[in-house]
Amino acid sequence: MRLHHVQVACPPGGEDAVRAFYADTLGLVEVDKPEPLRGRGGAWFRAHDATGEVVAELHVGVEDPFVPARKAHPAFVVDDEAALDRVVSRLRDAGHDAVDTERFTFPGYVRVHTVDPHGNRVELLAPSG
C-alpha cells in the first residue's frame, strides 16, 4: 500500500490563488483533473523527484462553507537543506511566512511550516546532515 494523494480545500473561486502558491511558489506541477470531476472546481498538483517520477500528489477541492486545515496538512520533502532554503526564499518573496521555530524538532529532518493563501497549513522538510 502507498499513499496516492492528500486533499486540502479552498473556498469557491480560490483556484487561482492555490495555483500561484502550489505551482509558482512551491514548484508543484498542475495536472488536469479527470473530465467527470472538472465541474467541481479545484486543482490537482504533482511533485516529481529528480528522475521525473511522481512522488506526491495534492488535490485541492472547493468547499462551501470553507474552513482551513490548521492541524492536518501535507508535508513535502525536498532534496536537501539548500533546496529547502530556496523554497523558503520563494515563499518570503511571494509574501508568505515560513516559520522555522520547529526547524530541528523532527529527527532526521529540518523543517518549516507555512500556510497556503487560504490558511491551510503546509510543512516542508529536508533530510538533515
Regions from the PLM with identified roles:
Residues 51-58, 119-121:
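Short, charged/polar, Gly/Pro-enriched secondary-structure boundary elements
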